[in-house]
Design a protein with these regions (language model features):
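Hydrophobic beta-strand positions in blades of beta-propellers and related beta-sheet-rich domains
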Residues: 69-71, 116, 137
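Short acidic-glycine-tyrosine-enriched beta hairpin
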Residues: 92, 105-122
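Long compositionally biased, domain-poor regions of proteins
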Residues: 69, 77, 99-104, 108-112, ...
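A short, N-terminal "cap"/entry segment at the start of jelly-roll beta-barrel domains
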Residues: 1-65, 146-174
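Short, conserved beta-strand element in jelly-roll/cupin
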Residues: 71-76, 85-102, 140-142
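Ligand-binding loop in jelly-roll beta-barrel domains
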Residues: 64-65, 108, 121-147
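Hydrophobic beta-strand residues in large extracellular and virion-surface proteins
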Residues: 56, 74, 102, 127, ...
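A short beta-loop-beta micro-motif enriched in histidine and acidic residues
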Residues: 59-68, 77-91, 113
Length: 174
């Protein structure tokens, strides 16, 4: 069975494989083909154990100055008690494989594939993989912009499997 969501599997291309996938970077955008996400381009973050990641977007002048996106891969027993080092950012986690065990503001949560977690700034949270399977998720981080007259948003935990799709007009539900 193929995965419902994309995530890199790492590894190295065969020596006989023609490598035509190339990332493209401009001042306005970046295109990162999935074939470029191999073991050689993984990164690591401080305070994360048994975890590697692929950087999809990171702060850089002209592209994403206040925004980053990673595809995280947490091995069994891995995770972090201090995942976010900047309390001025908000974050979104989207679980694409495995199960995440989160502690958010003192409450425990088990978030499975298809799970979505919105983390407002200054949220106290941890994330661990307590299973025998690899946990993979997208982590999107953005500098929080407060709006005068609006409270800071609440934590949101949901799963796309529990949400009825909204059909767009004139698409015959396709």
């Amino acid at each position: 069975m193929s995965a419902k969501y994309f995530y890199p599997t790492g590894g190295h291309p065969g020596q006989e494989q023609l490598l035509t996938d190339r990332a493209i970077f401009t001042n306005a955008y970046a295109v990162i083909p999935k074939g470029t996400m191999r073991d050689i381009v993984t990164s690591y973050l401080p305070f994360w154990d048994k975890t590697r990641l692929w950087v999809i977007a990171r702060p850089m002048t002209g592209f994403a100055e206040t925004f980053s996106q990673y595809i995280m891969e947490v091995s069994p027993g891995g995770g972090s008690d201090q995942p976010e080092t900047d309390m001025g950012v908000e974050g979104v986690l989207f679980i694409v494989a495995g199960t995440a065990f989160l502690k958010i503001n003192g409450e425990n949560y088990k978030v499975e594939e298809g799970g979505y977690v919105f983390l407002p700034p200054e949220t106290d949270w941890t994330l661990h993989n307590k299973t025998d399977d690899i946990l993979r998720f997208h982590w999107i981080r953005k500098a929080y912009e407060a709006v005068v007259g609006l409270d800071k948003p609440d934590v949101i935990i949901a799963n796309e499997k529990d949400i009825q799709p909204t059909i767009m007009p004139d698409t015959d539900g396709k």
